[in-house]
């Protein structure tokens, strides 16, 4: 078993001055913590993997393809591989768990 604490992951991500911290990688999936501060621009490009986002804190909008929805703590979003997507109108610091399948390269 592998277990993680969100507060420890956030501290590690912040200490490394990065927006993304991959903290688990297995044969069929990887998981990371993604952070965007209020007002930030999301620089993402489409990925070669399916993704699931679980918002652990913050508020924003996300556009996936041509669809846009508001997200906040507890929101879960599925993004198919190759589809354009980005968070925007980030009104509260956003922290998101990201699951990639297959694992991110």
List the predicted regions and their residue ranges:
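Short beta-strand/loop turn elements enriched in aromatics
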Residues: 28, 38-49, 102
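A short, N-terminal "cap"/entry segment at the start of jelly-roll beta-barrel domains
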Residues: 1-33, 43
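Ligand-binding loop in jelly-roll beta-barrel domains
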Residues: 81-105
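Structural motif
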Residues: 52, 59-61, 68, 84, ...
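Short, conserved beta-strand element in jelly-roll/cupin
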Residues: 36, 47-62
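Short acidic-glycine-tyrosine-enriched beta hairpin
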Residues: 67-81
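Short strand-coil-strand connectors
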Residues: 27, 63-67, 90
């Amino acid at each position: 078993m592998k277990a993680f604490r969100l507060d420890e992951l956030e501290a590690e991500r912040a200490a490394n001055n990065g927006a993304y911290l991959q903290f688990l990688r297995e044969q069929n999936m990887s998981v990371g913590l993604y952070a965007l501060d209020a007002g930030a621009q999301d620089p993402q490009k489409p990925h070669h993997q399916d993704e699931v986002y679980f918002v652990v804190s913050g508020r924003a909008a996300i556009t996936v393809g041509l669809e846009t929805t508001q997200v906040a703590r507890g929101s879960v979003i599925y993004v198919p591989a190759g589809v354009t997507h980005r968070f925007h109108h980030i009104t509260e610091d956003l922290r998101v768990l990201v699951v990639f399948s297959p694992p991110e390269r």
